[in-house]
């Protein structure tokens, strides 16, 4: 037998074992699933085969990366508790993501054993993966009733590939991102911490306490944890921090009843409904924050005398950017700060960055991989989506400058120490509601700033975001960072004609990356006009 024939035989035997095992996880979804910005999302009852097959591809990915760990998170984030999802963590951004997402879709949607065999064999050969190569997958899941079951299907997919796995159990999505990155870099100059939950909590608590020692804390922070995994993890973190430095009260923390997850609470509810979550009452101007179901998004809010004030991802981004620019200036360092947003960013925030802070702003398509990639263009990239998902990215070049920088005064020394510790506090691997909460609290304490003062950085242009169910979201294709429709043909021209009738009008339509729907976003000079513009665009979709 020739080497080629021997290789084919090994591949065939390997694939046959996978396909045979896959029979235990019958494909029940009748429509083509597509790996979107949030991975796969669907009714949980449809995801057993998807979980198994995604576990297989995660193993392939790790083998392609010479055994580097790949994360696989079971979560549907802010979606309803009856839904679930699967997302590969930390890796697709470093490879040709569109190619591997296409591989995933082919495998997940294969209808027969023969089709699955052809798909798997083709991927192994195209990617030049040798069956049985070293591979390792980290698995985590949220608090949904179906998550642990789906995680076991993932693990079965990993095991049949003869890959190693580590089941971290209940985690926030950002924690799994941290575990993967920490494991990849542990023991190297790029190490971010110990690749364990304890390592994560110790890293955050040490940095936070260092930054808050001697600072005045203004009252308790009320945290709406969306009845999700973030409730358990913020409570665990609090054990590592002096309670005088971290006065918190947690509501919507019932993770033992999965049906309550994201039910009239959580960051997505608060932002889209523009009202406080159930279960929370607070004094006027008290600091309140909402996480989403897997704790990668955060928004702040407060009760005014006669109104509700929302401080979304745009406002958090503004707070972070202003603080970092002032801090970097105080160190004497020459570092470029840049902002990355999506089309959902309020137009007033973009103007604040460009005209007040005088920093460059990039607009990219929604989704972590797009924001993360764009932020790498700067020494310090601050990227946020309006929904509260974002973080700060620091380049290797910037870190080298910080390490070698010679200070000329005690003030520069203190500023440099603070800057280094801020970069220790943030989770550069993913938007993280917990670390972003900590940094907001640090900045407000350092600036001796109230929520009301923070909210006055700029005044939002009135906007309206509407979720609209449609028969087929795939017909809505876009260009220009998803701000303009290409298809259905002629629809963009109709939207442009409507927008032109409104003072300060701006609007766009894009299909959701996480739900079977499209989203309509509109801005105009008044609340009523933005609402009217959005509703009139919705009429065009039906």
UniProtKB/Swiss-Prot annotation:
Q: Where is the active site?
A: 77
Metal-binding as UniProt keyword = yes
Cysteine pairs forming cystine bridges in this chain are: none
Record key words, sorted: Carbohydrate metabolism, Cell wall biogenesis/degradation, Cytoplasm, Isomerase, Magnesium, Metal-binding, Nucleus, Phosphoprotein
Which is a Gene Ontology cellular component entry for this protein?
nucleus
Tell me which domain of life the UniProt entry assigns to the organism this sequence originates from.
Eukaryota
Q: Which InterPro entries match?
A: A-D-PHexomutase_a/b/a-I, A-D-PHexomutase_a/b/a-I/II/III, A-D-PHexomutase_C, A-D-PHexomutase_C_sf, AMG1_II, AMG1_III, PAGM
Which positions bear Phosphoserine? 77, 82
- Which residues take part in binding Mg(2+)? 77, 292, 294, 296
As for subcellular location, the record says: Cytoplasm; Nucleus
Q: Which family does it belong to?
A: Belongs to the phosphohexose mutase family.
User: Under which name does UniProt file this protein?
Assistant: Phosphoacetylglucosamine mutase 2
Species source reads Schizosaccharomyces pombe (strain 972 / ATCC 24843)
């Amino acid at each position: 037998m020739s080497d080629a024939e021997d290789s084919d035989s090994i591949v065939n035997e390997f694939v046959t074992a996978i396909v045979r095992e896959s029979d235990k996880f019958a494909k029940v979804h009748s429509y083509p699933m597509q790996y979107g910005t949030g991975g796969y999302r669907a009714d949980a009852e449809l995801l057993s085969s998807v979980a198994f097959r995604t576990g297989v591809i995660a193993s392939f990915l790790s083998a392609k990366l010479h055994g580097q760990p790949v994360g696989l998170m079971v979560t549907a984030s802010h979606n309803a508790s009856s839904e679930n999802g699967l997302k590969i963590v930390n890796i697709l951004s470093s490879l040709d993501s569109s190619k591997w997402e296409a591989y995933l879709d082919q495998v997940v949607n294969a209808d027969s054993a023969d089709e699955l065999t052809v798909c798997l064999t083709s991927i192994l050969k195209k990617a030049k993966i040798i069956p049985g190569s070293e591979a390792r997958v980290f698995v985590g899941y949220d608090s949904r009733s179906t998550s642990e079951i789906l995680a076991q299907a993932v693990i079965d997919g990993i095991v049949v590939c003869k890959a190693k796995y580590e089941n971290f159990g209940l985690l926030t999505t950002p924690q799994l991102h941290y575990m993967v990155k920490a494991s990849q870099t542990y023991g190297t100059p790029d190490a971010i911490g110990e690749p364990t939950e304890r390592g994560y909590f110790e890293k955050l608590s040490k940095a936070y306490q260092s930054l808050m020692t001697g600072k005045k804390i203004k009252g308790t922070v009320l945290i709406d944890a969306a009845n999700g995994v973030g409730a358990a993890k913020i409570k665990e973190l609090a054990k590592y921090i002096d309670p005088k430095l971290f006065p918190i009260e947690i509501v919507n923390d019932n993770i033992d009843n999965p049906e309550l997850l994201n039910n009239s609470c959580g960051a997505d509810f608060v932002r889209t409904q523009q009202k406080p979550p159930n279960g929370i009452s607070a004094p006027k101007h008290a600091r309140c924050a909402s996480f989403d179901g897997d704790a990668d998004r955060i928004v702040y809010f407060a009760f005014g005398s006669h109104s509700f004030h929302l401080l979304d991802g745009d406002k958090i981004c503004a707070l972070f950017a202003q603080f970092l620019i002032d801090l970097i200036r105080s160190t004497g360092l020459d570092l470029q700060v840049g902002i990355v947003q999506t089309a959902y960013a309020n137009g007033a925030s973009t103007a604040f960055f460009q005209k007040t802070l005088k920093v460059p702003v990039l607009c990219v398509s929604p989704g972590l991989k797009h924001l993360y990639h764009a932020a790498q263009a700067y020494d310090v990239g601050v990227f946020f989506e309006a929904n509260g998902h974002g973080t700060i990215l620091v380049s290797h070049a910037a870190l080298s400058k910080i390490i070698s920088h010679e200070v000329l005064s005690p003030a520069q020394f203190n500023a440099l120490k603070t800057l280094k510790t801020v970069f220790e506090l943030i989770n550069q691997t993913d938007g993280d509601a917990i670390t972003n909460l900590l940094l907001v609290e640090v900045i407000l304490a350092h600036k001796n700033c109230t929520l009301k003062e923070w909210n006055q950085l700029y005044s939002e242009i009135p906007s309206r975001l509407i979720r609209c169910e449609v028969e087929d979201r795939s017909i809505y294709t876009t260009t220009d960072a998803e701000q303009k429709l290409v298809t259905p043909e002629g629809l963009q021209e109709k939207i442009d004609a409507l927008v032109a009738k409104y003072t300060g009008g701006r609007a766009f339509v894009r299909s959701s990356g996480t739900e079977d729907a499209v989203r309509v976003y509109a801005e105009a000079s008044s609340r009523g006009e933005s609402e009217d513009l959005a509703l009139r665009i919705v009429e065009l979709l039906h």
